[in-house]
UniProtKB/Swiss-Prot annotation:
This is Eukaryotic translation initiation factor 3 subunit E. Component of the eukaryotic translation initiation factor 3 (eIF-3) complex. It comes from Emericella nidulans (strain FGSC A4 / ATCC 38163 / CBS 112.46 / NRRL 194 / M139). Component of the eukaryotic translation initiation factor 3 (eIF-3) complex, which is involved in protein synthesis of a specialized repertoire of mRNAs and, together with other initiation factors, stimulates binding of mRNA and methionyl-tRNAi to the 40S ribosome. The eIF-3 complex specifically targets and initiates translation of a subset of mRNAs involved in cell proliferation. The lineage of its organism: Eukaryota, Fungi, Dikarya, Ascomycota, Pezizomycotina. CDD domains: eIF3E. Belongs to the eIF-3 subunit E family. GO terms for cellular component: eukaryotic 43S preinitiation complex; eukaryotic 48S preinitiation complex; eukaryotic translation initiation factor 3 complex; eukaryotic translation initiation factor 3 complex, eIF3e; nucleus. Residues 254-423 form the PCI domain.
Length: 448
């Protein structure tokens, strides 16, 4: 009801905690101001709560109040007002609004009672088909259902959502969508149900709604390219919630973001999304298809887009990709990896992926470094990976074992000898010249 509180940041992230290390880096690359315009106010709340572990708590409390004061979460908003004003009393305006909210809830419940009971009757539901017009005719003729009753489900669902009752909202909007032929309201209900599933952390259902929203954008807005661009931008941002919280969503959404329509949207409207796409691709290295052509294609596509969009957007995550695969600068890649870790730990969506990113990035640095050098100094490579010599030695042993490269470790000399196939000329090229002319060829080799 009105006392509901939006889900916490902890509930919507995969167990990662906010850290206050290197605040200057994290704050410099904070994307919250860019994300907020593309999110519903209820979806913004967990991001603000996450920031409360990093920023001035009093400012965050005030921001929460400004965010939610126009919703029907009256009890929670009243509590925020008390906290801001250091008061034990609740102003009359909140008491009055609470009474109004309760009265409206009762009104909507009464209006929709008949149709909600019918839709819970298995005998009635068993007679429904995929044809909405036929379903409405059946319900009208057999049970006296009217269009107004169907629309009451929509109004009631929206009101429950405004009260923070996201589970109830999802069910009501689903019931409305089953029966309604009003395309605009059905599209609105789909967005409402998507937000509700996100806020109840029902990721499988959320992904179903992502697909429905995508289909709606393609069909309903077919002749409206500007509308498609705006709606795709919203869908991209909303999809970040399941992207890093639901493993099966990772491949689906990575493919979606790389698809022509959506990568064009990212480049045109929201290039900062490259941070999340880069994090997804890099961490995909640790997943099942890390050696497959799918991963290699993702990496090549990422490198291409990062190179193209460098003038428009960059942060330590995209700069890491650029340093390693465009500039082939291992020292810069090491520097950017350290900064990237701090940015990841300060990002609501990526905090739980920070360790996986660092692990995968070290592997990518190692693999790239080993591919272009014949003799590798263990101490030097360890430094590039941000490890001490003992840790670096263990790392390299594991790398050789896991990737099955042909290499020998000379513990006495502290080196690794790479037995590259004689037909590979790229090592010779990179060791004899650092010219930019050859970097495209090296890139192809590293990403292959």
């Amino acid at each position: 009801m009105a006392a509901n509180v939006p889900p916490s940041a902890e509930a919507l992230t995969s167990g990662g905690a906010a850290h206050k290390t290197a605040e200057d880096i994290a704050n410099q690359y904070d994307l919250l101001p860019k994300l907020i315009p593309y999110l519903d106010r209820h979806l913004v709340f967990p991001l603000l709560e996450f920031s409360s572990g990093q920023d001035d708590d009093s400012e965050i409390v005030r921001a929460k109040y400004e965010l939610l004061k126009h919703t029907n979460m009256t009890d929670y908003v009243a509590n925020l007002w008390q906290e801001i004003n250091n008061s034990d009393t609740i102003p009359d305006e909140f008491v009055k609004k609470r009474e109004e909210v309760l009265a409206k809830l009762q009104h909507y419940q009464n209006e929709s009672e008949k149709i909600t009971e019918l839709l819970q009757d298995e005998a009635v539901v068993g007679n429904l088909r995929s044809d909405k017009v036929a379903n409405l005719r059946f319900l009208e003729e057999q049970h006296g259902v009217t269009i107004e009753m169907v629309n009451s489900l929509y109004d009631y669902g929206r009101f429950q959502y405004s009260c923070g009752s996201y589970g109830n909202a999802a069910e009501l909007l689903y019931q409305f969508r089953v029966l309604s032929t009003d395309n605009d309201k059905v599209a609105s209900a789909t967005w409402g149900k998507l937000a509700s599933e996100i806020l109840t952390t029902n990721w499988e259902a959320a992904m179903e709604e992502v697909q429905k929203a995508k289909d709606s954008i393609e069909t309903r807005l077919f002749n409206n390219p500007v509308g498609q661009l705006h709606n795709r931008s919203w869908l991209i941002h909303w999809s970040l919630f399941p992207f890093f919280n639901h493993d099966p969503a990772r491949d689906v959404l990575t493919d979606l973001f790389f698809s022509p329509a959506y990568i064009n949207t990212i480049q045109t409207s929201c290039p900062w999304i490259l941070r999340y796409l880069a994090a997804a691709v890099i961490t995909n290295r640790n997943r099942a298809h890390k050696n497959s052509s799918v991963y290699q294609k993702q990496l090549k596509d990422l490198i291409r887009v990062v190179r193209q969009e460098g003038y428009e957007y960059s942060d330590p995550i995209t700069d890491f990709v650029k340093a390693l695969y465009v500039d082939f600068d291992f020292e810069e890649a090491q520097k950017k990896l350290g900064e990237a870790e701090e940015v990841l730990r300060g990002d609501f969506f990526l905090v739980s992926a920070a360790d996986a990113f660092v692990e995968a990035a070290r592997h990518l640095i190692s693999e790239s470094y080993c591919k272009i050098h014949q003799r590798i100094d263990i101490k030097d490579l360890s430094t590039r990976l941000g490890l001490n010599q003992d840790e670096g030695e263990k790392w390299i042993v594991n790398l050789i074992r896991d990737t099955r490269v042909d290499a020998k470790i000379d513990y006495k000399e502290g080196t690794v000898i790479m037995n590259h196939p004689p037909q590979s000329v790229y090592q010779q090229v990179i060791e004899k010249t650092k010219g930019a002319f050859f970097r495209t060829q090296v890139l192809r080799f590293v990403a292959s």
